[in-house]
């Protein structure tokens, strides 16, 4: 049954307006973005098919155009709608953490990093550069691929920090597997970076590992001091 044929007030858009966006399921939120489904299949039903096919939102939003088009009813238009929604979310986070903003709210940092890295299908190691007052200078993605102690080069991190005249940094990387629990390699990388940055009198404030739905902070676990 198409959404337009549902009883009045039961569609996802009506539910959003009546009860708030937080009350919608993943499939209902996705249906609002899709706007319509197929003949005889509602947008919510199509959304459920997509979520089942990809195994969740993260993999779905990381899918390429060709991968999405494997699903009947999905083409370039719906792909563009989904990509626009992702990019808007990232730009909102970017505005919240723009250059010159004092980084005093850990939740703001977490939100920004989650939006930037959680949907990546590959590992990204990045650095948030701060001045002496912990104002944001720049967010830079340094390395991509398999992130381990052999693929993250402290000298490149130090070079960037010196170039940008940063006084403190927060490093971060994502786990495409979805889990945020740091590995032994993550801890080794952190120790190497902490030592390298100390030689130029720059503070490593934190190393954050981004998973599907959570972020683990080295500082909060006492692994930075």
From Swiss-Prot:
The keyword Metal-binding applies. GO terms for biological process: proteolysis. InterPro entries: MPN, RadC_JAB, RuvA_2-like, UPF0758, UPF0758_CS, UPF0758_N. Pfam families: RadC, UPF0758_N. GO terms for molecular function: metal ion binding; metallopeptidase activity. Residues 102-224 form the MPN domain. A motif (JAMM motif) lies at residues 173-186. PROSITE patterns: MPN, UPF0758. Zn(2+) binds at residues 173, 175, 186. Keywords: Hydrolase, Metal-binding, Metalloprotease, Protease, Zinc. PANTHER family: DNA REPAIR PROTEIN RADC, UPF0758 PROTEIN YEES-RELATED. Belongs to the UPF0758 family. This is UPF0758 protein Shew_3481. The lineage of its organism: Bacteria, Pseudomonadati, Pseudomonadota, Gammaproteobacteria, Alteromonadales.
């Amino acid at each position: 049954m198409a959404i337009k044929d549902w009883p009045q007030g039961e569609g996802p858009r009506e539910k959003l307006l009546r009860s708030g966006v937080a009350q919608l399921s993943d499939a209902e939120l996705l249906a609002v973005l899709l706007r319509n489904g197929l003949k005889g299949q509602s947008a919510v039903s199509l959304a459920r098919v997509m979520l089942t096919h990809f195994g969740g939102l993260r993999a779905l939003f990381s899918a390429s155009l060709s991968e999405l088009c494997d699903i009947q009813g999905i083409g370039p238009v719906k792909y563009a709608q989904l990509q626009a929604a992702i990019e808007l979310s990232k730009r909102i986070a970017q505005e919240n953490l723009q250059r010159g903003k004092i980084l005093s709210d850990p939740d703001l940092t977490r939100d920004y990093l989650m939006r930037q890295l959680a949907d990546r299908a590959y590992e990204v190691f990045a650095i948030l550069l701060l001045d002496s007052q912990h104002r944001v200078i720049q967010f830079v993605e340094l390395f991509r691929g398999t992130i381990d102690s052999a693929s993250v080069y402290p000298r490149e991190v130090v070079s960037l920090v010196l170039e940008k005249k940063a006084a403190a940094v927060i490093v971060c990387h994502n786990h495409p597997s979805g889990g945020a629990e740091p590995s032994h390699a993550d801890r080794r990388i952190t120790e190497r970076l902490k030592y390298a940055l100390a030689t130029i009198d720059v503070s490593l404030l934190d190393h954050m590992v981004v998973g599907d739905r959570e972020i683990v902070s080295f500082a909060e676990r006492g692994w930075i001091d």
